[in-house]
From Swiss-Prot:
Enzyme class: transferase
Subunit: The RNAP catalytic core consists of 2 alpha, 1 beta, 1 beta' and 1 omega subunit. When a sigma factor is associated with the core the holoenzyme is formed, which can initiate transcription.
HAMAP family for the chain: RNApol_bact_RpoC (MF_01322)
UniProtKB keywords: DNA-directed RNA polymerase, Magnesium, Metal-binding, Nucleotidyltransferase, Transcription, Transferase, Zinc
Keyword Thylakoid: no
Catalytic activity: RNA(n) + a ribonucleoside 5'-triphosphate = RNA(n+1) + diphosphate
Residues that coordinate or bind Mg(2+): D460, D462, D464
InterPro entries: DNA-dir_RpoC_beta_prime (IPR045867), DNA-dir_RpoC_beta_prime_bact (IPR012754), RNA_pol_asu (IPR000722), RNA_pol_N (IPR006592), RNA_pol_Rpb1_1 (IPR007080), RNA_pol_Rpb1_3 (IPR007066), RNA_pol_Rpb1_3_sf (IPR042102), RNA_pol_Rpb1_4 (IPR007083)
Protein name (record): DNA-directed RNA polymerase subunit beta'
Length: 1410
């Protein structure tokens, strides 16, 4: 019997599915979903509140209003289940079928679906090859369209106005057919022969020349192919039957007072039904054509409004003047179905309350109020009460719990034991915003939170609230404990640094106890061990900060994991010994034997985690906290006004600055300096004064002189509370102290520019009215910024999560040896990020080889941990190629090797880790700390004057990077290349400094030369751009005629004559074609050739250049022929902060981007046009370019400053004209790696300025997603269309297949999409639709019959399955395996016959009847 029932069950549809397909519904399909037709616009009877028959809420069509009860009341109860009442026609079943039973409306005339008409690009328009305007004219009954031309001169699809139609009727009679309205459009679409049309277009494309035409044709071809492949029929874009939403999804609720609250959809449906019925009646009456036509148009409009109100014409409004919410509005936007109900749901078994500190808790605990716990764990308590026999039924158990009997509390204790709960604080900006804790029952009503996890939650105790959630199933509890427990989340996933780090009071306490105090009680005592020290301290024989000697037992952990301990005598203080008591074995004493500022504490915790392990670290962190609180209490440290000591020298400094400013004002008044220069100088003076005041204030506050044991003066760090707060990193910073005790300094206006009157007072002295006003002026902007910032930052995070949500680690190793080459980030003389920091936790892509030999230092595939970093730093390696997400070859997701270390755990990433979301959160979470403002270069910002030399900071060896030089006779080198760099390496061979060297700079050192720190090794004139000779010879001038192409000037003081070349625009017409040039010849007058090339030494002189040689002068190598004055490049605002990050990720083109050379070759200038210069690049040796031309031309606006001049050679991708970089150009000309480096460095610059650490690999994951599309440039033998956008991986796979078959692969170009575009271009339509532009995405997906394979996380959340990441990845893999096994076994088993099913049915019915 059971087998038979199982057999029946197995025949039904299964819940297992692996994809969702969206398509167009045919009219028959709509009717097949329907349970009946809605014929009347009535909803419910206002007296009886019963639904009207055949109305919008009809019980006969949609099902009963009450469970198992028909409308007239004849059948009630379960036993009549399935019977249809003969009186009212209602099926007796559950009332919830009213949530899924649909109905339909038979439309009297077909109606075009507005989505396919108006959602751009219009699908109907594309298919019929008509403009949207003309289709609308037909649909809304303004024109006729010819549907069948017959044997006439008319064409199919031609529009006719009324007059033209009547004329044609007279001329041709019934030969042709023309219609209007949706019927006409439907007819035209029925007549399309998809296959033939597609074939015709395929033949047309190769014979078409114009780009736009090809684009148009390929768009149409794609659409036609989509229809052919998906099995959708074009005529289904016109509705014949309109589906009606189940009534419980558009409810009508009676309010008190006899009014009803209703969903807007009911209004919209009523309109459609009314018009439809009226149209039916008019058609039955054979009404005049014009009336019928009008009614049809109104029907079309009312269906449009139902589907997407406001898409065409004015939106239909309700009684409250608001537009009605149509079906399209129900699914889109933050309040729509996707974001409100599918991606974000409310959760049962949860509660929220205010949080307070729990300084006595352990790290894995939280205090849960008893009242809350009782409510949250109710079901567990009920089952326990029943199990123990304390309550007979659930109802009795419920009563016991409500009465709060004593036994209930005992049971609650048991239930809660080791049952973790999740705590969440909104906004949840990264994954550490939800962590698991073990609850500890407490009295009161507030949740207690462990202070160390506040940093992760970004929580404080000023009234923040948190939510508690209970994981119910055993698996959920297990995951909460193993993965989400606060003790397992010590490191931040963004940077890999500890995030469980003491702050504020705790830091202060630890700092205070580890400070030294000169001549404290018991100084100089010697102790044998820790115990003796603590006995002496607690019996008050020795002060906490006394300097003493102690014999300690120190354990050092070896790399191999062995540890060895040793005894030694150390100089230390009592407080440090007390701290040493709680430090785990394996940490060297040196890490503790210093004042413990916040950074030092963080370093200890980090070291402890890496060397000693997780468990010890957690215990240690807790002990640190308890001890810190204890001693910060004991320190009694507090501040009063007198702690802010104002330096005596302040008044004098301000007076001096004032005097300087007055002097400049006087110069300005007499016209010696310009307005801008005065402003900059004044601001410079005040910034300097402010720094000096701050310096003397910090000196006064941070040191104090005391008498020591010997009675001599000794200087020690001050015990001033304010200084201690700032020095320890507990609270405040020198900048804040400066405002309290120094001077407030310069203030900014809301637009970011600096006010030149500074505030000379500080907060201790108090501000006067003017000063107060100046402060508020810029401060208000700050507050407004903060509000905007939060929203913008949230939106950035949302876009990032959306673009990266489907990146999961899917395999161990993809086997590529590609990667990014990593070098230290050096700006000028500072190493901003060392190579070690950049490659830590990455996998080496290719063997690292010792310079100048073939010894392998680091084999490929090595994961670089802290030990390796030390080794690599000591070997003097400068560059390592590491595996990267960008170059990973995995088809879906990324492999573990390319990703490297899981930052939050410190070991190689596991398969299933959702790295995309982690990357998005790591970049988005600090977003609120970034600024919103654009910095104006002005005042304090522009103090760096134009550099004119390179001064090295430390000694080292000089290295030249792609600098072309010529040597003068004196031995100096002159740079004759643009993008050259000069670097300084230390003794180990690591680069420590790096400087850009401009063209024409004089370099006084050679490659490999040793230089001392402070020596100047290169200099140049920042205001002119020289033209340098590369060979020696005699000068021959050409094309120089005074007054036509040049102007002579004689300096009155020196009597020297200089020649200025006139700009072509300033020359008289006779001189336009003259090309002033200098040619170098040898003694015999033969032209000299440049070294290593066949080109003559011929230097063109550009306009505005100044030149002082005469015919026949001799010049040496490296001499300057002419100088071109540089106008100061315009000061640009630098966009900083959040807008800059958004610009980079959206891959926006800057306003005036730098222009790069498209090919390598020689530069020359062609004929100028009005306002533009023509730059011509000729490839060397007469090579021919891909498009068959012999050179490359580009027009550049005249106002752009060019960095190249005539006759110079440039390399592909070199900058020709300055400006902000355009990432698309970098990708096209320099490749993926250069682009990755550019975006990573630019984004890191923004975050570094705010002191935020983010690992490079997060940015790389996002960049990988931005690069996932390519544009097809050549079709080859593939099925792709030229100009279409395809997934990179898809093209690679297709090309591999084609190569294997020996056919022509497709050619393509990588494309860079901004994150919004990339999210919308994802393969999954569910993910794209739930992100933005829902209507457009769904329209496109349904026309092309897209299948969503549910690969990403978002799609799976929407359809309510486990996500394919973490434990879900294994679950899905297992499911797939099972299904494949079943498919294999099923093929062998025999099929079920109809007879067997019938037998089983009768059997089953008998058993249920008995």
């Amino acid at each position: 019997m059971k087998d038979l029932l199982n057999l029946l069950k197995n025949q039904g549809p299964s819940d297992e599915f692996d994809g969702i397909r969206i398509g167009l519904a045919s009219p028959d399909m709509i009717r097949s979903w329907s349970y009946g037709e809605v014929k009347k616009p009535e909803t419910i009877n206002y007296r009886t509140f019963k639904p009207e028959r055949e109305g919008l809420f009809c019980a006969k069509v949609f099902g009963p209003v009450k469970d198992y009860e028909c409308l007239c009341g004849k059948y009630k109860r379960m036993k009549h289940r399935g019977i249809i009442c003969e009186k009212c026609g209602v099926e007796v079943t559950l009332a919830k079928v009213r949530r899924d039973r649909m109905a339909h409306i038979e439309l009297a005339s077909p109606v075009a679906h507005i989505w396919f008409l108006k959602s751009l690009p219009s699908r109907i328009g594309l298919l019929l090859d008509m403009t949207l305007r003309s289709i609308e004219r037909v649909l809304y009954f303004e024109s006729y369209v010819v549907t069948d031309p017959g044997m006439t001169t008319l064409e199919k699809g031609q529009l006719l106005t009324d007059e033209q139609y009547f004329e044609a009727m007279e001329e041709f009679g019934d030969e042709f057919e023309a219609k209007m309205g949706a019927e006409a459009i439907q007819q035209l679409m029925k007549d399309i022969e998809l296959e033939r049309e597609a074939q015709e277009i395929r033949e047309q494309i190769p014979n078409t020349n114009s780009e736009t035409k090809i684009k148009k044709l390929s768009k149409r071809l794609k659409l036609l192919e989509a229809f052919i492949q998906s099995g959708n029929k074009p005529e289904w874009m016109v509705l014949e039957a309109l589906p009606v939403l189940p009534p419980d999804l558009r409810p009508l609720v009676p309010l008190d007072g006899g009014r009803f609250a209703t969903s807007d959809l009911n209004d919209l449906y009523r309109r459609v039904i009314n018009r439809n019925n009226r149209l039916k009646r008019l058609l039955d009456l054979n009404a005049p054509d014009i009336i019928v036509r009008n009614e049809k148009r109104m029907l079309q409009e009312s269906v449009d409004a139902l589907l997407d109100n406001g898409r065409r014409g004015r939106a239909i409004t309700g009684s409250n003047k608001r537009p009605l919410k149509s079906l399209a509005d129900m699914i889109k936007g933050k309040q729509g179905r996707f974001r409100q109900n599918l991606l974000g749901k409310r959760v049962d078994y949860s509660g929220r309350s205010v949080i307070v500190t729990g300084p006595t808790l352990r790290l894995h605990q939280c205090g849960l109020p008893k009242k809350m716990a009782l409510e949250l764990f109710k079901p567990f308590i009920f089952s326990k009460l029943e199990l123990r026999g304390l309550a007979t039924t659930i109802k009795a158990a419920k009563k016991m719990v409500e009465r709060e009997e004593p036994v209930v509390w005992d049971i609650l204790d048991e239930v809660i034991r080791e049952h973790p709960v999740l705590l969440n604080r909104a906004p949840t900006l990264h994954r550490l915003g939800i962590q698991a804790f073990e609850p500890v029952l407490i009295e009161g009503k507030a949740i207690q939170l462990h202070p160390l996890v506040c940093a992760a939650y970004n929580a404080d105790f000023d009234g923040d609230q948190m939510a508690v959630h209970v994981p119910l199933t055993l698996e959920a509890q297990l995951e909460a404990r193993a993965l989400m427990m606060s003790t397992n989340n010590i490191l931040s996933p963004a940077s890999g640094e500890p995030i469980i780090v003491p702050s504020q009071d705790v830091v202060l306490g630890l700092y205070w106890m580890t400070r030294e105090r000169v001549n404290d009680k018991g100084e100089g005592m010697i102790f044998s061990d820790i115990k003796e020290v603590s006995r002496a301290f607690y019996s008050k024989q020795v002060g906490l900060q006394a300097r003493i000697k102690v014999r300690i037992d120190e354990t050092i952990m070896e790399e191999s994991g062995e540890s060895e301990s040793s005894y030694r005598m150390v100089d230390t203080t009592v407080g440090r010994m007390l701290l040493w008591e709680i430090v785990p074995k394996g940490i060297p004493f040196e890490m503790i034997n210093k004042p413990m500022v916040k950074k030092a504490i963080s370093a200890v915790i980090n070291f402890c985690y890496r060397i000693v392990g997780l468990k010890a670290t957690v215990i240690f962190a807790d002990q640190l906290m308890y001890m810190g609180y204890d001693f910060s209490t004991k320190s009694g440290s507090s501040i009063g006004v007198n702690d802010f000591e104002i330096p005596e020298a302040k008044a004098g400094m301000i007076e001096r600055a004032d005097a300087e400013v007055k002097e400049i004002e006087a110069q300005y008044a007499s016209g010696l300096v310009a307005q801008g220069e005065k402003y900059n100088k004044v601001i410079d003076i005040w910034s300097r004064a402010n720094d000096l005041v701050a310096k003397s204030m910090m000196e006064g506050i941070s040191k104090e002189t005391v008498k020591n044991k010997q009675g001599e003066d000794e200087e020690q760090a001050s015990f001033n509370s304010v200084f201690m707060y700032a020095d320890s990193g507990a609270r405040g910073s020198p900048a804040q102290i400066r405002q309290l005790a120094g001077m407030r300094g310069l203030m900014a206006r809301p637009d970011g520019s600096i006010i030149e009157t500074p505030i000379t007072a500080n907060f201790r002295e108090g501000l006067n009215v003017l000063q107060y006003f100046i402060s508020t002026h810029g401060a208000r902007k700050g507050l407004a910024d903060t509000a905007l910032k939060t929203a913008n930052s949230g939106y950035l995070t949302r876009r990032l999560v959306d673009v990266a949500q489907d990146v999961v680690i899917t395999e161990q190793d993809c086997g590529t040896d590609e990667g990014l080459s990593m070098t230290p980030v050096i700006e000028g003389g500072d190493v901003i990020e060392s190579l070690g920091d950049r490659i830590l936790g990455r996998v080496v892509a290719r063997d690292v080889i010792r310079p100048n030999s073939d010894e392998i230092l680091v084999p490929a595939g090595t994961m670089i941990d802290e030990k390796w970093v030390e080794r690599i730093e000591s070997m003097g390696i400068d560059e390592v190629t590491v595996r990267s997400a960008i170059s990973c070859d995995a088809v879906f997701g990324i492999c573990a090797q390319c990703y490297g270390r899981d930052l939050a755990r410190g070991h190689r990433a596991n398969v299933g880790e959702a790295i995309g979301v982690i990357a998005a959160q790591s970049i988005g979470e600090p977003g609120t700390q970034l600024t919103m403002r654009t910095f104006h270069i002005g005042g304090a910002a522009s103090r760096a004057s134009a550099a004119d030399s390179v001064e090295v900071k430390q000694e080292g060896t000089v290295r030249l990077h792609n600098i072309k030089v010529v040597a003068r006779e004196s031995g100096e080198l002159i740079a004759v290349s643009r993008s050259g760099e000069l670097a300084l390496a230390d003794a180990a061979g690591r680069e420590r400094e790096r400087y850009k060297i401009p063209y024409g700079a004089v370099i006084t050192v050679k490659e490999g030369e040793q230089v001392k720190g402070g020596s100047i090794i290169a200099k140049w004139d920042p205001h002119t751009h020289p033209i340098v000779t590369e060979v020696a010879g005699r000068v021959v001038l050409a094309g120089m005629e005074d007054g036509l192409s040049i102007r002579k000037q004689t300096d009155e003081l020196t009597g020297l004559t200089t020649i200025e070349i006139l700009d072509p625009s300033e020359r008289p017409s006779a001189g336009k074609d003259l090309k002033p040039a200098v040619t170098l010849v040898d003694e015999n007058g033969n032209e000299l050739k440049l070294a290593n090339s066949e080109q003559p030494a011929h230097y063109m002189l550009p306009g505005k250049s100044i030149f002082s040689l005469k015919n026949g002068d001799t010049v040496g190598v490296g001499d300057i022929i002419a100088r071109i004055p540089q106008e100061g490049s315009k000061t640009r605002d630098i966009t900083g902060g959040l807008p800059r990050v958004a610009d980079l990720f959206e891959a926006r083109k800057p306003k005036e981007p730098s222009i790069l050379a498209e090919i390598s070759g020689t530069v020359s200038f062609g004929k100028e046009t009005k306002g533009k210069r023509r730059l011509v690049i000729t490839p060397p040796n007469g090579a021919v370019l891909e498009d068959g031309s012999t050179h490359y031309e580009v027009l550049i606006p005249k106002h752009r400053h060019l960095t190249v001049f005539e006759g110079e050679t440039v390399a592909k991708g070199e900058v020709v004209s300055d400006g902000p970089s355009n990432p698309h150009d970098i990708l096209r000309l320099k490749g993926v790696e250069a682009l990755a480096n550019y975006i990573t460095n630019e984004i890191q610059d923004v975050y570094r300025l705010q002191g935020v650490k983010i690992n490079d690999k997060h940015v790389e994951v996002i960049v990988r997603q931005m690069l996932r599309k390519v544009e097809i440039t050549g079709m080859g033998d593939s099925s792709f269309v030229k100009g279409e956008q395809v997934e990179y991986i898809a093209v690679l796979q297709e090309n591999e297949k084609l190569r294997a078959e020996g056919r022509q692969p497709a050619r393509f170009e990588r494309q860079l999409l901004g994150i919004t575009k990339a999210s919308l271009a994802t393969e999954s339509f569910i993910s794209a639709a739930s992100f933005q532009e829902t209507t457009r995405v769904l329209t496109e997906a349904s026309v092309t019959g897209k299948i969503d394979n549910l690969r990403g996380l978002k799609e799976n959340v929407v359809v309510g399955r486990l996500i394919p990441a973490g434990t879900g990845l294994a679950y899905h893999a297992e499911r797939r395996r099972k299904r494949e096994d079943q498919a294999g076994s099923k093929a062998g088993s025999d099929t079920v016959s109809a007879a067997e099913i019938e037998a089983a049915l009768t059997e089953a019915l008998k058993s249920s009847a008995s």
